[in-house]
Amino acid sequence: MSKIIIACRDLYKSYFQGNLEVPVLHGIDLQVNEGEMVAIVGASGSGKSTLLHVLGGLDKPTRGEVTLLDRELSTISEAERGSLRNHALGFVYQFHHLLPEFSAQENVAMPLFIRRMNKKAAMEQAAAMLQRVGLGHRLTHTPGELSGGERQRAAVARALVTRPACVLADEPTGNLDRHTAEAVFDLMLELNHEANAGLVIVTHDTQLASRADRVLHLVDGMLQ
């Protein structure tokens, strides 16, 4: 039986504008097993990114619970949540969020530096991961010297360099042309399969989503 990596139960999320409550998520139930890819499809403004942020411990639910590697996030301290997030999760976004003043290799090594890995080992591991995503010849290049597809490949490498239990991807190909998007998506699937990690991807691209193990639709804050 596959291990449950990340799950939420009876999840609600609202934002408040003064006294006005703006509900975003309504009673979400979800679990993702190791090695499983789940695609969540929804229109802009449907709450996809909010759901991903709550699952990743970047935002707190209004009600309900989120469990990551059998630990309920609301029951642990902020420091413990940060440590668990850094060790168990990888994040990929539509915009690469690479640090412009650092090389591709240094950017990919950042999560390892946060883990206090020594610099030599971290840089070697980052170089190996960049080689794996086809950027072994671009180690010393800054993000400004990379193409859009190369920057997103570097972002994927950064998300996976720590060998996370689950990757949360928010429109990871939304800023790319179709050919490059498919190449980056193929790479994510291949690397995630090799690592037997969970993968949750939110997207409006139904063609790419159809390749997931499960496709869920977020409509009016509810999963269908």
Curated annotation (Swiss-Prot):
Oligomeric form and interacting partners: The complex is composed of two ATP-binding proteins (LolD) and two transmembrane proteins (LolC and LolE).
Report the EC code(s) recorded for this entry: 7.6.2.-
The family assignment reads: Belongs to the ABC transporter superfamily. Lipoprotein translocase (TC 3.A.1.125) family.
What topology does it adopt in the membrane? Peripheral membrane protein
The record, for Gene3D superfamilies, names: P-loop containing nucleotide triphosphate hydrolases
Which locations, inside or outside the cell, does it occupy? Answer: Cell inner membrane
Q: An example Gene Ontology cellular component term from the record?
A: plasma membrane
Q: Which SMART domains match?
A: AAA (SM00382)
Q: What is this protein called?
A: Lipoprotein-releasing system ATP-binding protein LolD
* GO terms, biological process: lipoprotein localization to outer membrane; protein localization to outer membrane
One matching Pfam family: ABC_tran
Matching PANTHER family: IMPORT ATP-BINDING PROTEIN, LIPOPROTEIN-RELEASING SYSTEM ATP-BINDING PROTEIN LOLD
